[in-house]
């Protein structure tokens, strides 16, 4: 993508013909993006291509507005006009979000600048104290966890971490936990249970690591044991799918009393590319697979797998980490407050019932 998208050139031309120059030009610029997007809404162009183009244009526009706001620090009228332009951008982003396909939401869930669990922990959980190791083999940097404060209570926070740059991604194994990671998670959950502390998990994982060493060290056993032990954990437990919720790798830290999903997160039994390769022998059929798998937060909410959809800032969580974290914190407080009032036996019975009621099957009699 060029440093100055195509519509920027049109805006510059508009600026030269306007009396005040810059702000009318930006206003014209946003109007051009809106017009292009309206054309896509009427089916005149490929929706996916238009969304991608519009998002690029809007990101560039926002950067220009931010620079203009600094320059207009002493001009109240100009600042107000720029603030109104920001609101128009937010409105357009929300219009686009309402029409996103399952594949487009998958791309947002995988966005490289999307906030990861450590970003949420930094903003939501003060005094986070990380605990390392599974006391059996090693410490797994792909899975993090420790005690923290949350709205006056102590909680155990556990999450998967992908890493931002190449060095961090290699260190975190691209966010794919080994069996020692899942055993560490279980160790922390049992620690929380011993001291009567709620458990919160932040899930953003493409899947459990499928390497030979992981299989030799009992990846399947580690996941299976977690599923069993989480089902009978005697403390309130809330899981939040913040990005990708990939198959057993996600479920291994998400058998919770409440499963919350960010608006643009996904939760699936298999990656869309993997599904396309198996079902159609063609990984390029990923858009069809994404729709068929019912992986979006809205789909999971309707199917009874998720309990709440957490709204994201306009355009996605990567546009405003603080706003995204605030929305997660509000949802956590609501559900933890509800769960803490329940007797342990009721908690266990409802959790068991929740997961037993998820499956749907058809019996065929020949």
Where are these regions (language model features)?
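Short hinge/gating elements
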Residues: 106-109, 170-172, 315-318
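Conserved catalytic cores of soluble enzyme domains
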Residues: 49, 203-333, 337, 341
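Terminal peptide-recognition signature
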Residues: 61, 101, 157, 204, ...
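Short, low-complexity intrinsically disordered segments enriched in A/P/G/S/L with frequent Arg
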Residues: 3, 10, 15-16, 23, ...
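Charged, alpha-helix-enriched surfaces in structured cytosolic catalytic cores
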Residues: 56, 112-119, 139, 143, ...
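Glycine-rich beta-alpha loop segments
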Residues: 98, 123, 127, 137-139, ...
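Intrinsically disordered, low-complexity segments enriched in small/flexible residues
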Residues: 1, 29, 33-37, 43-154, ...
């Amino acid at each position: 993508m060029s440093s100055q998208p195509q519509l920027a050139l049109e805006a510059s031309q508009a600026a030269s013909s306007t009396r005040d120059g810059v702000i009318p030009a930006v206003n014209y610029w946003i109007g051009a993006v809106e017009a292009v997007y309206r054309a896509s809404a009427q089916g005149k162009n490929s929706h996916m291509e238009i969304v991608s183009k519009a998002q690029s244009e809007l990101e560039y526009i926002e950067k220009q507005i931010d620079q203009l706001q600094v320059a207009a620090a002493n001009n109240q009228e100009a600042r107000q006009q720029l603030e109104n332009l920001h609101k128009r951008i937010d409105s357009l982003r929300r219009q686009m979000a309402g029409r996103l396909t399952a594949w487009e939401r998958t791309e947002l869930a995988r966005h490289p600048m999307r906030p990861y669990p450590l970003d949420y922990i930094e903003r939501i959980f003060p005094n986070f104290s990380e605990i390392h190791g599974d006391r059996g083999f090693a410490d797994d940097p792909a899975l993090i966890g420790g005690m923290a404060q949350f709205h006056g209570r102590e909680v155990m926070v556990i999450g998967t971490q992908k890493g931002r740059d190449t060095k961090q991604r290699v260190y975190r194994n691209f966010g794919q936990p080994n069996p020692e990671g899942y055993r560490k998670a279980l160790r922390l959950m049992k620690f929380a249970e011993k001291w009567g502390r709620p458990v919160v998990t932040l899930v953003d994982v493409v899947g459990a690591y499928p390497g030979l060493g992981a299989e030799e060290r009992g990846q399947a056993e580690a996941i299976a044991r977690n599923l069993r032990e989480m089902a009978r954990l005697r403390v309130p437990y809330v899981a939040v799918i913040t990005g990708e919720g990939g198959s057993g790798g996600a479920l291994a830290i998400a058998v919770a009393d409440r499963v919350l999903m960010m608006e643009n997160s996904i939760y699936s039994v298999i990656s869309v590319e993997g599904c396309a390769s198996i079902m159609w022998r063609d990984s390029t059929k990923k858009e069809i697979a994404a729709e068929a798998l019912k992986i979006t937060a809205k789909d999971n909410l309707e199917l009874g797998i998720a309990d709440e959809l957490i709204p994201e800032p306009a355009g996605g969580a990567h546009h405003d980490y603080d706003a995204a974290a605030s929305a997660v914190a509000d949802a956590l407080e609501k559900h933890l407050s509800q769960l803490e009032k329940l007797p342990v036996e009721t908690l266990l019975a409802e959790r068991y019932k929740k997961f037993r009621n998820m499956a749907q099957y058809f019996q065929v009699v020949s």
